[in-house]
Amino acid sequence: CTQDYGSMTLTASFDSLRCLPEKRTTRLSHEQETATPAYYSVTLPDEHLQAEMTGRSRSAIFRFSYQKEGKAYLIVNPNSDEGEGYIEIDTLQKRIYGYNPVHRIYQGWGEPAGYSGHFIIDYQKDLCDFGTFREDSLFPGQTKIGHEKNIGIYIGFHVKSHEQVLV
């Protein structure tokens, strides 16, 4: 058995860049949430956005609808407890790529499973800000980081009121 199959986390925020998971928590109401097997939607009032997602067997489409004008961020983490993940951004192709080596959680616990989960995130907006991070340290303009714990990439872009962003 393997852990997380090389998962990653994609988080949207508005107005302030918060990279660490414990700092980007936000309030939500289940009354503002819709969940079906084919669609998920939630309104995040503190982030001034609605996040929507639909999926296929190996991909997903995210739509973020911003309720007011300002600066929006997407934060992406390779979820590697062992600090073996890697992530990079290609700003010309408007693409974020990464991988996360998978480790066993039952027989042979902690040993490498022999494969990695890979991910690609395509975005459409022109960026006004991007970089990498490790823990609370930001590295503006840096395009790749890897093989350490609590790493990721952030991208920032300007949005207009009621603008929708597809990822």
Enumerate the language-model features and the residues they cover:
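Accessory carbohydrate-recognition regions in carbohydrate-active enzymes
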Residues: C1-V167
